């Protein structure tokens, strides 16, 4: 298996992910489990404990227009949500040009 897509309720992917899975397949998580880099903010926002905080720093925000090279090398990809994608792609050219 090369790639695993997860589309689960908040908290479920984080409770299932482990080094064994990541050593065998790239994981693309469609939930928000690995989008927010601050565990305390994640837990406050979703009202649940994050079950895999050790993988948060490794997860790459999967917006290919901005993080293409990082995504290619990543084992764990946090698929961006629709509102952040729209907002980010709208302002990114302005930020990039300063």
Which stretches of residues belong to each language-model region?
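N-terminal Rossmann-like NAD(P) cofactor-binding subdomain of oxidoreductases
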Residues: 1-98
């Amino acid at each position: 298996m090369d790639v695993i897509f997860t589309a689960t309720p908040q908290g479920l992917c984080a409770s299932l992910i482990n080094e064994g899975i990541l050593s065998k397949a790239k994981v693309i998580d469609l939930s928000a489990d690995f989008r927010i880099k601050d565990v305390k903010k994640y837990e406050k926002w979703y009202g649940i404990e994050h079950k895999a905080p050790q993988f948060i720093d490794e997860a790459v925000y999967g917006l290919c227009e901005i993080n293409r090279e990082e995504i290619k090398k990543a084992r764990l990809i946090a698929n961006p949500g629709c509102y952040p994608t729209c907002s980010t792609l709208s302002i990114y050219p302005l930020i990039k040009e300063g």
